Amino acid sequence: MNYIIKQKPEDFIVKEVPNKIFNKINGKYLIYSLKKINRNTEDCIQHLSRTLKVPRKFLGFAGTKDHNAITEQYISVFNVQNLKSKIENIKGLENFSLEFIGYLDNPLSLGDLATNKFEITIRALDKKVDIENPHSIINYFDEQRFSKNNHIIGKAIIKKDFKNAVEELKKQNQTNNELIKTYKQDYIRILRLVPKKTLKFYVHAYQSYLFNELCKKIIIDDKINHFKINYVLGELFFATKEPKNYSLPIIGFGSEIQEKNSLVFNLLKKEDIDQRDFIIKQIPELSSFGTQRDFIAKVINFSCTEFEEDELNKNKYKVKISFELSKGSYATIVVKKIFAQH
């Protein structure tokens, strides 16, 4: 069934549910609620760093949030002298605002949240349908992670095929052609012209691709009833009933392959890679140890409104769904699962 999400920012609302209790009296770090609209989290953090004239490392957050959305999350700011009053007197913040919440003795860092709460308006629906609680999803990474060739660049870096990585980067206009001419075949130097964070994102995109492929192999191997939907890198398989959960590797040089060993090793063989390929001596900061991720993500506190006429799309319907997901899981996968069955 066709649909539209994020037709306007109010259609996609995300709020963090923290896993910490904030002190109301004092602490080494100030905690603020950051509310933003159509802004990247890191853009807001960099803006605050410049405005307050403090190092970027003084500011922390628990997770990045969607750009094309209204989001609410928590940030920490190192509590140096008079900084709280400086923040209170900031003027002219564009598309984001701050509200003081309390204190912590440690900074917020990636992963310091319990869940994310979503309110999503689904638009341009041809008809009213019965929407059932999905209860769980296969914990795929969704299309936002990949674009057209992010994972291809990532694999080229992992394989030390730096020439191909540069060629693929040129397709994304991530490199300066004049500098490429200057450095000619010094591909490692050319790659270092790209921000480190961006290069890491490409490596993570390839790791995410491997994870998705592993999930699909498990569905086939466990003979799980499923249906398929298309996405930017092929197909995703969705289980019709909740299957057994597994702790799966986000493959890196230090990943512990605890379950489904043969499927993991067959996938690595098919991709012609080895775990030690994730050690990148030429650009050490891109090396990736790896981590674990659940095969299944629970959909918590799911609810759905009645269908209404869609004021933005003539002769169409809209509906709002609300739910929570654990950190790192994709709300758009929940939407895919619900509407692919109609």
Language model segments and positions:
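Extended, charged/glycine-rich binding lobes that contact polyanionic ligands
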Residues: 1-24, 29, 37-40, 51-314, ...
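Ser/Thr-Pro-rich, acidic low-complexity intrinsically disordered regions of eukaryotic RNA-binding
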Residues: 41-47, 331, 335
